[in-house]
């Protein structure tokens, strides 16, 4: 391979190195450190799911066994394509603002948003601020 900087090539995560990322994380944080982080992130995701369920017009669309939450705002009067456009609009507002980074995806042919909580320094206050920003973006997209 001439002209290729092999130092810039990533490690192949095939059969032999599939668990390399996890191994590095366990070596850095230890098993107990990884457990603490996962428990915190799962608790934050479940807290957010409870807040979403408690808020009229908002739905959690799938179980939350780990730290990813699938949600959608379904205000009265919006259905099908209009609801899809609205969902994409408020998710885009959040992503452009930098308040969070959400992943729009389809579920049963309709757009929804995935929130994944897992950054190293994420605390409950960050998740609460994101929830407030999501509701504000949804309100602004509705106008």
Identify the residue ranges that each predicted region occupies:
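Short, small-residue-biased leader/transition segments that mark boundaries at the very start
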Residues: 2-9
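A residue-level signal for beta-strand positions that form part of recognition/binding surfaces
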Residues: 6, 19, 112
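Cytochrome P450
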Residues: 10-17
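A generic fold-level signal
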Residues: 4, 17, 63-64
């Amino acid at each position: 391979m001439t002209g290729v900087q092999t130092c810039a090539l990533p490690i192949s995560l095939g059969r032999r190195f599939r668990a390399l990322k996890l191994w590095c994380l366990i070596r850095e944080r230890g098993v107990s450190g990884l457990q603490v982080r996962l428990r915190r992130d799962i608790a934050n995701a479940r807290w957010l799911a409870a807040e979403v369920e408690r808020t009229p017009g908002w739905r959690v669309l799938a179980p939350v066994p780990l730290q990813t939450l699938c949600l959608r705002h379904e205000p009265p009067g919006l259905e099908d394509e209009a609801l899809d456009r609205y969902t994409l609009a408020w998710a885009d507002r959040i992503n452009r603002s930098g308040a969070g980074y959400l992943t729009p995806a389809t579920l049963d042919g309709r757009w929804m948003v995935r929130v994944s909580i897992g950054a190293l320094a994420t605390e409950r206050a960050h998740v609460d601020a994101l929830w407030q920003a999501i509701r504000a973006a949804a309100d602004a997209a509705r106008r």
